[in-house]
Amino acid sequence: MSLNPRDVVIVDFGRTPMGRSKGGMHRNTRAEDMSAHLISKLLERNGKVDPKEVEDVIWGCVNQTLEQGWNIARMASLMTQIPHTSAAQTVSRLCGSSMSALHTAAQAIMTGNGDVFVVGGVEHMGHVSMMHGVDPNPHLSLHAAKASGMMGLTAEMLGKMHGITREQQDLFGLRSHQLAHKATVEGKFKDEIIPMQGYDENGFLKVFDFDETIRPETTLEGLASLKPAFNPKGGTVTAGTSSQITDGASCMIVMSGQRAMDLGIQPLAVIRSMAVAGVDPAIMGYGPVPSTQKALKRAGLTMADIDFIELNEAFAAQALPVLKDLKVLDKMDEKVNLHGGAIALGHPFGCSGARISGTLLNVMKQNGGTLGVATMCVGLGQGITTVFERV
């Protein structure tokens, strides 16, 4: 396809190996260092991109405190080859933070406010816990269901509303680990994982080029034996069918179609459309349905036109209703999360939006797809979606 000057193109994507938050490979690596390493290596890999041209580093991060505080985008950028004259901002849309970072860069390019951007995100959930420093307003319960901030309970609610069984969830969780392991063995993650140093279980420093979160030994029987994690009496959502708590970062180089053509760069993809949407916080995980419908309408497409889909696996009980109402549940094995998802790889909040987008682009490239959708739910009732076309 030919590019228009203000088209938004993805030049390259990379991510860290996903590390377990409890005693994992990144336990002695700070979030800023993880981010800076990733940005530096991705720029090194793309020699035609001059770091001096970077308009802004836009980095997603949810818990912006401790080592992730004081604008971690700038903290990380200062430790890379990007000059001090380039800007940096940290953004949060909870789970959708780094996809929002991508959207912010895209909107700037579309409106002529820059040509080259570095976007992505990080979350070190081992160093900065999910609830560190959080003080929810008790008056929120006057406006939304009291349990709306407990993501696992919103997944229970959504699963119950849509008749999702425990066995269906366990099968979905098993699928995630099996596909992620298969992708690892077959080298499908080779282009997206940027190797980095970390510590193994014995405390030895080594270079990791694989995700340590995947459990190939997972069985249906093992998953069936797990107790409910959020609703002890009658619940169906378990640790085995929920996204893992992990540490990781993801990064993309994004630019205008004109600049890519000027530099002789063959992009991975162009953004066709973007959308966000809100839903009742009590069914937080349903957000990808309206946001995807909105994005497809903006692109003049239907779900039947889409070759591959990456849906963030916050919970199996959440993902299955979304796939059902997007009318792709019966095509899941052909189109959806072909390299596994967050149940196997984890969901470091600030990292995941760019991570699923980049993984989607690799799936499209490896399987000859043209159109793809990356979408995810967002805590407290939102959805965010990006439609990509491979070029």
From Swiss-Prot:
<keyword id="KW-0276">Fatty acid metabolism</keyword>
<dbReference type="InterPro" id="IPR020617">
    <property type="entry name" value="Thiolase_C"/>
</dbReference>
<keyword id="KW-0963">Cytoplasm</keyword>
<comment type="similarity">
    <text>Belongs to the thiolase-like superfamily. Thiolase family.</text>
</comment>
<dbReference type="GO" id="GO:0006635">
    <property type="term" value="P:fatty acid beta-oxidation"/>
</dbReference>
<dbReference type="InterPro" id="IPR020615">
    <property type="entry name" value="Thiolase_acyl_enz_int_AS"/>
</dbReference>
<dbReference type="InterPro" id="IPR016039">
    <property type="entry name" value="Thiolase-like"/>
</dbReference>
<comment type="subunit">
    <text>Heterotetramer of two alpha chains (FadB) and two beta chains (FadA).</text>
</comment>
<feature type="active site" description="Proton acceptor">
    <location>
        <position position="347"/>
    </location>
</feature>
<dbReference type="InterPro" id="IPR012805">
    <property type="entry name" value="FadA"/>
</dbReference>
<dbReference type="InterPro" id="IPR050215">
    <property type="entry name" value="Thiolase-like_sf_Thiolase"/>
</dbReference>
<dbReference type="GO" id="GO:0010124">
    <property type="term" value="P:phenylacetate catabolic process"/>
</dbReference>
<dbReference type="InterPro" id="IPR002155">
    <property type="entry name" value="Thiolase"/>
</dbReference>
<keyword id="KW-0808">Transferase</keyword>
<keyword id="KW-0442">Lipid degradation</keyword>
<feature type="active site" description="Acyl-thioester intermediate">
    <location>
        <position position="95"/>
    </location>
</feature>
<dbReference type="InterPro" id="IPR020616">
    <property type="entry name" value="Thiolase_N"/>
</dbReference>
<dbReference type="GO" id="GO:0005737">
    <property type="term" value="C:cytoplasm"/>
</dbReference>
<comment type="pathway">
    <text>Lipid metabolism; fatty acid beta-oxidation.</text>
</comment>
<dbReference type="GO" id="GO:0003988">
    <property type="term" value="F:acetyl-CoA C-acyltransferase activity"/>
</dbReference>
<dbReference type="Pfam" id="PF00108">
    <property type="entry name" value="Thiolase_N"/>
</dbReference>
<keyword id="KW-0012">Acyltransferase</keyword>
<feature type="active site" description="Proton acceptor">
    <location>
        <position position="377"/>
    </location>
</feature>
<comment type="function">
    <text>Catalyzes the final step of fatty acid oxidation in which acetyl-CoA is released and the CoA ester of a fatty acid two carbons shorter is formed.</text>
</comment>
<protein>
    <recommendedName>
        <fullName>3-ketoacyl-CoA thiolase</fullName>
        <ecNumber>2.3.1.16</ecNumber>
    </recommendedName>
</protein>
<dbReference type="InterPro" id="IPR020613">
    <property type="entry name" value="Thiolase_CS"/>
</dbReference>
<dbReference type="Pfam" id="PF02803">
    <property type="entry name" value="Thiolase_C"/>
</dbReference>
<keyword id="KW-0443">Lipid metabolism</keyword>
